[in-house]
């Protein structure tokens, strides 16, 4: 009996060590990273990789939200410290709307999401959260009034004036330099993602790890912030188990 208790204790220590320093599991609850990550994807995050190397452009990272370190976000690194980011106006004839494309160091960064576009809301309420493996829910809800999404893709006053190299006629920064030790991140679903365009850069110390594989995926219903709690997180897991997406299980997450 004593041997079994010791073995169980060692297993618990090993699991805690792995989760703290090597890998942790998360569930994707929002569409901000579509089509790369879907609602109901269960991912593993490598927490050791950035102890051995620096984050690179294209890496899909989990990080502590700079405005509230208790919140975890997942986004893709678009630019690193020293990079120059510029937004170019582009008229989308298909959707009859002006959008902005992004270039890093003069090279156009292509975003391929073709899903539903949300271009015009008087009040755009954005919800984003990550579910940790233990069922804890990290969530928030932000309402941007009047200014957000009038020009999709635009940077909305997130960049300080000393870093901005160019403003457009509306006073929004459209060209800037990322400071050393910081990262500019965006969601793959550009027009439905709260990211560096709205709240600025991610400090190096906020980065927790790199997403590297979808270990399970299942179709689940979406949740409102009011519905999100540990009980509904368990319910989402049950839904996912009953409605698997076999083609996504075990899918590696390739850097762009």
Swiss-Prot record:
Q: Can you tell me which residues form the catalytic site?
A: 32, 75
E.C. designation(s): 3.4.21.89
* Superkingdom in the source lineage: Bacteria
Q: Which CDD domains match?
A: S26_SPase_I (cd06530)
Query: Mitochondrion among the record's keywords?
Result: no
S-adenosyl-L-methionine recorded as keyword: no
What does the entry give for GO biological process? signal peptide processing
Name of a matching Pfam family: Peptidase_S26
Q: Which reaction does it catalyse?
A: Cleavage of hydrophobic, N-terminal signal or leader sequences from secreted and periplasmic proteins
Coiled-coil segments on the chain, per record: none
Question: What top-level class of enzyme does the UniProt entry assign?
Answer: hydrolase
Task: Name one cellular component (GO) term.
Answer: membrane
Please state which protein family the record places this protein in. Belongs to the peptidase S26 family.
- List the molecular function annotations (GO) for this entry: serine-type endopeptidase activity
Query: What is this protein identified as?
Result: Signal peptidase I
